[in-house]
Regions:
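Alpha-helical recognition segments enriched in aromatics with Gly/Pro capping
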Residues: 1-2, 107-109, 166-329
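Residue patterns forming the tRNA-binding/recognition surfaces of aminoacyl-tRNA synthetases
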Residues: 1-176, 187-191, 259-260, 291, ...
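A glycine-rich phosphate-binding loop feature that marks nucleotide/adenosyl-phosphate handling sites
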Residues: 2, 39-49, 113-121, 282-285, ...
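Acidic/polar loop patches that form or flank catalytic/metal-binding clefts of enzymes
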Residues: 33-36, 211-212, 272-279, 315, ...
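Conserved phosphate/anionic-ligand binding catalytic regions in large, soluble enzymes, centered on
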Residues: 46-48, 53-54, 101, 107-108, ...
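Short alpha-helical scaffolding segments that buttress acidic/His motifs in well-ordered protein cores
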Residues: 98, 219, 223, 263-264, ...
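A short secondary-structure junction motif
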Residues: 222, 226-230, 288, 321-325, ...
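Acidic, turn-prone loop/beta-hairpin segments
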Residues: 362-391, 422-509
Length: 509
């Protein structure tokens, strides 16, 4: 409760902060007060109620980091960071100055630290259930199973009583409910309330060993994710070894001292290698006024309202094009999402709508997905520009540079709508269905179909609609979804840099 105990009798029962003046006077009377004054500094407060926290010195378990640092730095040097300055900057410097890691917590819920201690000074770190059973007496094993059975029965009764009342309310399928009812939990329950009652036999003196009361820091568990998800090394060793290190992870800038760090510590300690090969680090999203987002203050737009009002695609593209993907803070604004919709989504949809409108009027159907061998310079130019765009986007995506992709896409949409379609409109409008008109349709069809695949990772919903409609007339060669297609490969033979330069000069003139 934040009150002094009998260890300091003069202030027993007083709130820690209320005794400051009395403590100061006691030190002064003893002639040991060197200086008294006030300093301004940051002080930790409870993130829920803003109450000042109290520092308390306690004994804890630490993981020694110093012997691992050199290997951690070498492993970090092999990781591709986006943005790259984090590797040797914030993350690398963090490793260099990292203290020993306090891996224990004094709370009830959590993974029990599997260390048993004996009064003779001997300690055992238990590495598996099998080892735990070996060190336990038979009575303790049976006691654990009995406690587990009682717990499961109690939980099962509560779940059935409460869930039964609400199945209808949430329209939960009865078959699913029966399936859950039949599911049981392994009898080897090692939650704290059970494992704390498991005393081991000391192999040194034969006396009783008791588990240390602390639980693991949850960040230790986060760093264990690659191994825990496969129950490695006890199961699925081949699956783990095939997928470790991970090819790619992504998280916020704060994780340079969190998940990225704990993954690196444990991978270096266990295997002497990096835990991941590529990492994209995003910045922190702030309120429009630059303040931290707060549920209590409600200083942000409801995400559901943003999705319903502006769409998931617009929000997704806005975030991909924001400073957030460069590990910089983003002041979120609905205006920014709206502007992205006007700059990209609407022009792209209008280009698709233009094609569909006139293709339906002329009953035009595609012979296939490929671009025609048109001699028209506009057709050759837009196909060249498309392949150049595919090449540039693919190159940046290969290097995880998401923030460099959207400007390329915006530029292509601008060229497609404000130059190609605008300068080709009369080819679609004319009444006769000659070769030039057919080439215009086939070219625009190919461009829209290919570009929908390029845009699919960025506008997943809009591109799915466009792709499915455009391929509905194709008898063969199309996927059921744009997201099942391979990313387009640039056709270098269709890229004409000289023609692109001439067209750019024409536009500027």
């Amino acid at each position: 409760e934040g009150r002094f105990t009998g260890a300091v009798a003069p202030w027993q029962g007083k709130l820690v902060f209320d005794a400051d003046e009395e403590i100061t006077q006691t030190i002064k009377k003893a002639g040991r007060l060197v200086h008294r004054g006030k300093i301004e500094h940051r002080y930790p407060h409870c993130y829920r109620c803003d109450t000042p926290l109290i520092y308390k010195t306690i004994e804890t378990w630490f993981m020694k980091i110093e012997p691992l640092k050199q290997n951690m730095l070498e492993n970090n040097g092999r990781i591709h960071w986006v943005p790259d300055h984090l590797r040797d900057g914030r993350f690398g410097k963090g490793i260099e100055s990292a203290p020993d890691w306090n891996v224990s917590r004094n709370r009830y819920w959590g993974t029990p630290i599997p260390i048993w201690q004996c009064e003779c000074g001997h300690s055992e770190c238990v590495g598996s259930l099998k080892q735990l059973h070996t060190l336990m007496g038979a009575g303790d094993r049976e006691k654990g199973k009995q406690r587990h059975a009682e717990t499961v029965a109690k939980v099962s009764r509560s779940v059935k009583e409460e869930a039964g009342k609400r199945l209808g309310e949430f329209k939960v399928d009865a078959a699913w409910a029966r399936k859950i009812e039949a599911t049981d939990i392994d009898e080897n329950d090692i939650h704290r309330h059970i494992v704390d009652e498991c005393d081991l036999i000391c192999p040194v003196c034969g006396q009783t060993m008791v588990r240390t009361p602390e639980v693991l820091d949850c960040w230790f568990e986060s760093g264990s994710m690659p191994y825990a998800q496969n129950h490695y090394p006890f199961e699925r060793a081949e699956a783990f070894e095939r997928n470790f290190p991970a090819d790619f992870i992504a998280e916020g800038l704060d994780q340079t001292r969190g998940w990225f760090y704990t993954l690196t510590v444990l991978a270096s300690a266990l295997f002497g290698k990096e835990a991941f090969r590529n990492v994209v680090v995003n910045g922190i999203i702030l309120a429009e006024d630059g303040k931290k987002l707060s549920k209590r203050l409600r200083n942000y737009a409801d995400p559901v309202d943003v999705l319903n009002g502006l769409g998931a695609d617009a929000l997704r593209l806005f975030l991909i094009n924001s400073p957030a993907v460069k590990a910089e803070d983003l002041r979120f604004s609905e205006r920014g999402v709206s502007e992205m919709s006007r700059a990209v989504l609407l022009p792209f949809w209008n280009a698709y709508s233009f094609f569909v409108t006139y293709a339906n009027v002329d009953n035009w159907t595609p012979a296939g997905p490929h671009a025609p061998a048109s001699e028209n310079e506009l057709d050759r130019w837009v196909v060249s520009l498309l392949n150049d765009t595919i090449r540039r986007v693919n190159d940046q995506m290969e290097h995880y540079n998401l923030y460099r992709v959207v400007p390329v896409l915006v530029s292509f949409i601008d060229n497609l709508t404000n130059w190609y379609i605008r300068r080709s409109r009369r080819r679609f409008w004319k009444s006769e269905n000659d070769a030039d008109k057919t080439n215009a349709y086939a070219t625009l069809y190919h461009v829209l179909l290919s570009f929908s695949k390029v845009m699919a990772p960025f506008l997943p919903f809009m591109t799915e609609t466009i792709y499915r409609n455009l391929t509905s007339a194709l008898k063969t060669g199309s996927c059921t979804s744009v997201h099942l297609c391979s990313f387009p490969a640039a056709d270098g033979g269709r890229i004409d840099e000289e023609l692109e330069e001439k067209m750019d000069l024409t536009r500027r003139a």
